[in-house]
């Protein structure tokens, strides 16, 4: 007798994307709907929290309805609801969590509060319905999680078991991209703008520093950011036109080198079977190319559509919690500063 498929409804509202998704058996994407607020926040040069939460309130229920419709299903066919519990913006997280609780109560469904960072890890194994399945995960593995708010190096020995090896001591990688983009007067968000500007640039034009911290798996990008600032100031003082393409390419190369070298070193140290690179910054072509050009380790990088925040990854992680009976009650609170290493 065939085993019953397990369908999870995922809800994501941790920052400036409102998203819902239906996932079957932890990996098959039946639907994934995202409403982005990027254009609304551009004039602020970053996410404005109060605006973000208001926009989530407007968008979230229609987004969930659309995700269910695209999956040709209803709440009656869903086995559990997974929602981002943290980390993220408190006002944004509450919107998703409260609606998830209401739906779970109304439909008598289990609810699972998922860590946003573990969601990014599980995005690496998702694939759309009707396409070729992605390879199953092999443990142990090292996951590099790089986004606007986080730069984390995680050792994962089995499902839902995480050991934080290191993280950023100052700016996250995505935050550094945004700040340098502003220095170069490039539009928000900084990641895509830097990548676009770097296309015709020389990555060796400026020898920006790489903070290769010894005896630690931590990262630091503040020195690199300061070096770009000083270079820009020096060029302006001497009335030279800013070589935007070269500056962008050189900065991007420095970030890529630091992330790549540290991750490969950790993979070698812990004798892992594969590497995952995930989070918004994993959409960067230079970073993707660096990892794909090495042959020592199998590498999983999600497709571009799953690098930025989405609900498919929340449902994907939620499936494994459901299978392990890691369920929450309706009284749980959101956790804006929730670290990933809560289960080791």
What are these regions, as identified by a protein language model?
Residues 120, 302-342:
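Glycine-rich phosphate-binding/hydrolytic loop that grips phosphoryl groups
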Residues 1-4, 114-141, 317:
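Conserved phosphate-binding catalytic cores of ATP/NTP-utilizing and phosphoryl-transfer enzymes
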Residues 195-275, 284-292, 297, 322-325, ...:
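A contiguous, well-structured pocket-lining segment that forms one wall/lid of small-molecule binding clefts
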Residues 5-77, 83-87, 116:
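N-terminal beta-alpha supersecondary unit
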């Amino acid at each position: 007798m065939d085993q019953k498929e397990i369908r999870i409804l995922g809800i994501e509202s941790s920052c400036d994307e409102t998203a819902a998704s239906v996932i079957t058996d932890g990996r098959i994407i039946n639907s994934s709907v995202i409403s982005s607020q990027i254009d609304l926040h551009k004039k602020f040069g970053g996410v404005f929290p109060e605006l973000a939460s208001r926009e989530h309130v407007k968008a979230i229920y229609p987004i969930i309805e659309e995700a269910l419709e695209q999956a040709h299903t209803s709440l009656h066919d869903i086995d559990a609801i997974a929602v981002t519990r943290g980390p993220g913006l408190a006002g944004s997280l509450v919107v998703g969590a409260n609606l998830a609780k209401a739906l779970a109560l109304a439909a008598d469904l289990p609810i699972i509060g998922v860590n946003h960072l573990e969601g990014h890890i599980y995005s690496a194994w998702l694939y759309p319905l009707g396409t070729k399945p992605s390879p199953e995960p092999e443990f142990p593995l090292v996951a590099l999680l790089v986004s606007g708010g986080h730069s984390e190096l995680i050792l994962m020995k089995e499902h839902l078991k995480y050991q934080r090896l290191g993280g950023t001591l100052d700016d996250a990688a995505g935050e550094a991209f945004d700040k340098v983009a502003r220095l170069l007067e490039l539009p928000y968000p900084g990641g895509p703008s830097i990548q676009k500007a770097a296309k015709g640039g020389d990555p060796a034009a400026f020898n920006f520093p790489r903070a290769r911290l010894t005896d630690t798996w931590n990262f630091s990008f503040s020195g690199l950011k300061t070096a770009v600032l000083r270079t820009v100031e020096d060029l302006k003082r001497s009335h030279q036109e800013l070589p935007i393409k070269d500056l962008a390419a050189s900065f991007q190369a420095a970030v890529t080198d630091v992330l790549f070298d540290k991750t490969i070193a950790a993979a070698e140290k812990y004798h892992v079977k594969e590497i995952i690179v995930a989070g918004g910054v994993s959409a960067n072509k230079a970073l993707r190319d660096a990892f794909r050009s090495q042959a020592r380790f199998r590498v999983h990088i999600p497709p571009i559509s799953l690098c930025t925040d989405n609900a498919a990854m929340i449902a994907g992680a939620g499936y494994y919690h459901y299978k392990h009976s890691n369920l929450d009650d309706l009284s749980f609170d959101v956790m804006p500063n929730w670290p990933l290493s809560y289960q080791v």
